[in-house]
Amino acid sequence: MQLNQVIVVHKAGDRQSKEWADRASRQLQQRGANVLVGPSGPKDNPYPVFMASVTEPIDLAVVLGGDGTSLAAARHLAAAGVPILAVNVGGHLGFLTEPLELFRDMEAVWDRLERDEYAMQQRMMLQAQVFEGSKAHPEAVGDRYYALNEMCIKPASADRMITAILEMEIDGDVVDQYQGDGLLVATPTGSTCYTVAANGPILHPGMEALVVTPICPLSLSSRPIVLPARSSVSIWPLEDHSLNTKLWMDGVLATSIWPGQRVQVTMADCQARFIILRDHYSFYQTLREKLAWAGARIPYHNNHRN
């Protein structure tokens, strides 16, 4: 990997993350790299400025923060194919990030990257678009939105909790009308986030699939469904025309959906590219360590394992 054009992103408002970002920037500049640095957070989005400022392709994005900072990087950089080195600095769970211990000797990290001594993990993304008009002549409304974890469709109100009534269609066939708090359309990566909290299945991030999960449905028969990756999921809000439904991407507000409009969710035509520094990365170990995944309450010794 060449390190000619690098962006360094730190978690907004986090002093430790900012200090590591400044150190990384200085070292990369000493190696001759052109470096752009900026904060990322709920009120800070450095990526439009980054994209408008660079004069050559971005070789690397160093993202110092937690999972939220990494998700934002994936949403903005996947379409450009930028490799992301996400490091858990100032984060909490760190499900998508490399441990800080592997980043403390940054000079050694830059050497490894230049010698291509790392693994690249590609993760499926989602894209969503709001449409209005007839099915025969749909008109796109607003932007196209991207997510690494999930798209969430649920109503919003400032003064009361609203029950959603959503109709879902898959590849042109009406599946059901859901009554509850909303619907999740997730990637395998997102299956271990909001989806698993809503009693959805866990999918390995190395596969490509969609999983649709009702949020607190008012029916015992409403169950999650796993779909082929090329499926097209369309969701209509029904009932109250005075209320709008919100589309959320990875927990961030994307746009509003009004009755008469629908949101179409499909697999994106790009993937998030995460750099893995760990020698023995294990998804199952991550589940055990980060999500406290456990089976038997009493551990038993396996005498048959060599």
From Swiss-Prot:
The keyword Lipoprotein does not apply. Its EC number is 2.7.1.23. Gene3D superfamilies: Probable inorganic polyphosphate/atp-NAD kinase, domain 1, Probable inorganic polyphosphate/atp-NAD kinase, domain 2. Its main location: cytoplasm. It is an enzyme of class 2 (transferase). InterPro entries: ATP-NAD_kinase_N, ATP-NAD_kinase_PpnK-typ_C, NAD/diacylglycerol_kinase_sf, NADK. The active site is at residue 67. One of its GO terms (cellular component) is cytoplasm. SUPFAM superfamilies: NAD kinase/diacylglycerol kinase-like. Its cofactor is a divalent metal cation. It catalyses: NAD(+) + ATP = ADP + NADP(+) + H(+). NAD(+) binds at residues 67-68, 149-150, 181. The keyword NADP applies. Keywords: ATP-binding, Cytoplasm, Kinase, NAD, NADP, Nucleotide-binding, Transferase. This is NAD kinase 1. The lineage of its organism: Bacteria, Bacillati, Cyanobacteriota, Cyanophyceae, Acaryochloridales.
